[in-house]
């Protein structure tokens, strides 16, 4: 499953690998990878494979789920497709409460005591997913865990999720993606080394000249 999804993401250009010409994230950090899972919305077969995979993860790890919650905005569509497949209620969670109207942070009906699984498109440092989890917990929901399309497998993300006491499972990850990219001839040994070094310590830009 991990390599299949990784292959899909590479084929449609949802993931870009540029170890020799790094991207600069909004945080200022240099990165050899950029992920835009919103592109999956435009490819029916890919988004169907993702929805089926997320459903499988949820049934395996969180079988008692009662409602699906999407993170705004990238997780909303995938949460909708998964909830439809599973015939479950759905809501979505904003990064912060609206400044007008009812001031809702959670849109849709999430009731106190309901068992929720959060659907996220990408796990990097885990910040947006944890914000979603905290909002649901404050509303009295029981958050069973998070499922996502892809994770960078960053230690900072793992540590934050552990500190928040929330389980997280992804359809694909950085390791599988770099392996598939190498198998497809998209990157060579030198590029693979740079990608591996970045993964070990993203904050240290020594990987750029590795």
UniProtKB/Swiss-Prot annotation:
InterPro entries: OPRT, Or_phspho_trans_dom, PRibTrfase_dom, PRTase-like
Keyword match Transferase: yes
Residues holding orotate: 124
Entry's EC annotation: 2.4.2.10
Cofactors that this protein relies on: Mg(2+)
Function per UniProt: Catalyzes the transfer of a ribosyl phosphate group from 5-phosphoribose 1-diphosphate to orotate, leading to the formation of orotidine monophosphate (OMP).
Name of this protein: Orotate phosphoribosyltransferase
């Amino acid at each position: 499953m991990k390599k299949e999804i990784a292959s899909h993401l590479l084929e449609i250009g949802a993931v870009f690998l540029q170890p020799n010409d790094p991207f600069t994230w909004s945080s200022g950090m240099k990165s050899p990878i950029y992920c835009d899972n919103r592109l999956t919305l435009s490819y029916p077969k890919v988004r169907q494979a993702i929805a089926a995979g997320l459903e499988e993860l949820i049934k395996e790890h969180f079988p008692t789920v009662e409602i699906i919650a999407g993170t705004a905005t990238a997780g909303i569509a995938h949460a909708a497709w998964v909830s439809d497949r599973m015939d479950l209620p759905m809501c979505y969670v904003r990064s912060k409460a609206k400044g007008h109207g009812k001031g809702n942070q959670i849109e849709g009906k999430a009731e106190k005591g309901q068992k929720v699984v959060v659907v996220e498109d990408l796990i990097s440092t885990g910040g947006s997913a944890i914000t979603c989890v905290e909002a649901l917990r404050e509303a009295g929901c029981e958050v069973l865990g998070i499922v996502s399309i892809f994770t960078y497998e960053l230690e900072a993300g793992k540590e934050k999720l552990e500190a928040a006491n929330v389980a997280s499972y992804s359809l694909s990850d950085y390791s599988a993606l770099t392996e598939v990219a190498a198998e497809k001839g998209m990157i060579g040994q030198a590029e693979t080394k740079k990608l591996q070094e970045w993964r070990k310590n993203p904050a240290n830009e020594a990987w750029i000249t590795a």
